[in-house]
Regions:
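Conserved Rossmann-fold NAD(P)-dependent oxidoreductase catalytic core, especially the SDR/UDP-sugar
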Residues: 85-120
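Glycine-rich NAD(P)-binding loop of the Rossmann-fold in SDR/ketoreductase-type enzymes
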Residues: 36, 70, 74-85, 119, ...
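Substrate-positioning beta->alpha
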Residues: 152-182
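N-terminal Rossmann NAD(P)H-binding glycine-rich loop of SDR-like oxidoreductase domains
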Residues: 1-22
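Mid/C-terminal beta-alpha module of Rossmann-like enzyme folds, strongest
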Residues: 176, 180-223
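NAD(P)H-binding glycine-rich loop region in Rossmannoid oxidoreductase-like domains
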Residues: 38-78, 89
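Adenosine-cofactor binding site in Rossmann-like domains, unifying the SAM/SAH pocket
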Residues: 21-44
Length: 240
């Protein structure tokens, strides 16, 4: 498959390329394809139309989370307007759009969220990603992946004991994404429900721990874990 990666300089896209044997990737730098500028994306689609059939949109402002609270305009320009621009060009040029979303679109209190459960983001980051999802859903040829992932090795010296997620490492998330390219709708992508500390400790027994009350400068979820039944059914009950 011929795939345009938006956000291609990020760690997740690096893993897609690493595990993407048999696929051909276009990874334009931001100066060539800036999602905030419609004309920039339009120019790229016009000149490289025949070189890709799929678009994986992983370009977004993510961390630090406080940025989205202090400067929501930045989130809107990139995560919302930028995504809308991508959607419009995918529609015009008939490209399959795979949108990389997040577990932060859920309310983050009850856990075990299904794709069909109500969404109620608790941060501006989550709101910006949900707004992106809404734009994507206005185009039929789409796939939305709500992924809970982190880099390996874990980038911090301590991990949260009182936050539950369905974390998986970016390597695994990339492998799974490449298996799902021809699916449609919304799919939760993640591992088992557990605290961040429990997840990290399996790879790093010496990891320290902390609590939300000690580290958070913005509101954070206590349980964003996801129900991944649909994912397991698609992959024949095998996560990796």
């Amino acid at each position: 498959m011929n795939i345009l990666l938006i956000g291609g300089s990020g760690k997740f896209c690096e893993k897609l390329i690493k595990y993407g044997d048999g696929h051909s990737f276009l990874t334009p730098p931001k100066k060539l394809l800036d999602v905030r500028e419609f004309s920039s994306i339009e120019y790229f689609f016009q000149h490289y139309d025949t070189e890709f059939d799929y678009v994986i949109h992983a370009g977004a402002i993510t961390r630090p989370m406080v940025v989205h609270e202090e400067n929501p305009t930045l989130s809107i320009q990139t995560n919302v307007i930028g995504t809308a621009n991508v959607v419009m060009l995918c529609k015009e040029y008939n490209k399959k759009l795979i949108y990389i979303s997040t577990d932060y679109v859920y309310s983050g209190t009850d856990g075990n969220y299904k794709e069909t459960d109500a969404v109620k983001p608790f941060t501006n980051y989550g709101r910006s990603k949900l707004a992106g999802e809404c734009c994507v859903q206005m185009y039929d040829n789409n796939l939305i992946l709500r992924i809970a992932m982190t880099t390996k090795p874990f980038p911090h010296t301590k991990a949260l004991k009182d936050m539950k997620k369905s974390y998986m490492y970016t390597d695994d998330a990339a492998k799974i994404t490449l298996k799902l390219l021809d699916e449609t709708g919304i799919i939760n992508v993640g591992g088992e429900s557990q605290s961040v500390y429990e997840f990290v400790k399996k790879e790093n027994p010496d990891i320290g721990f902390n609590y939300l009350s000690e580290i958070s400068d913005v509101k954070m979820a206590t349980d964003c874990s996801m129900n991944t039944t649909r994912l397991k059914e698609i992959l024949d009950d095998t996560i990796i």
